[in-house]
Amino acid sequence: MCIRDRYYDAYYKKAQQVRRLIKNDFDNAFSNVDVIMTPTTRGAAFEIGSKGSDPIQMYLEDLFTISANLAGLPAMSLPNGNIDNKPIGLQIIGNFLDEPSILNFAHMYQTKTDWHLYTPEGMKK
């Protein structure tokens, strides 16, 4: 038996405590708002076909999506512009079991913007 196996229960309990704190923070936020918006990633999309060689950097690209996943909340990403001809995304997070709010917001957003129609230069339309 390795040390990790001996502490599995303690790690699991601690992870559940952290998850509960994250969920509580979202519950507090949703008492004042219908949706929460964040960037989807820290920057623009990667070049097509490129793979990051640094797993930590790849993990950090998902940083903004982790909290919604841990809290069990619905979330989606919408096109929200571009940087150097590479798309950037807007993440919309909804309250627990409230997918209609993020879908309605996404529809409203796309009727007011045209980012969903953007095709990067060099891509087929």
Where are these regions (language model features)?
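Structural helix-boundary/capping segments
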Residues: 4-24, 70-125
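Serine-dependent amide/ester hydrolase catalytic core
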Residues: 4-70, 119-124
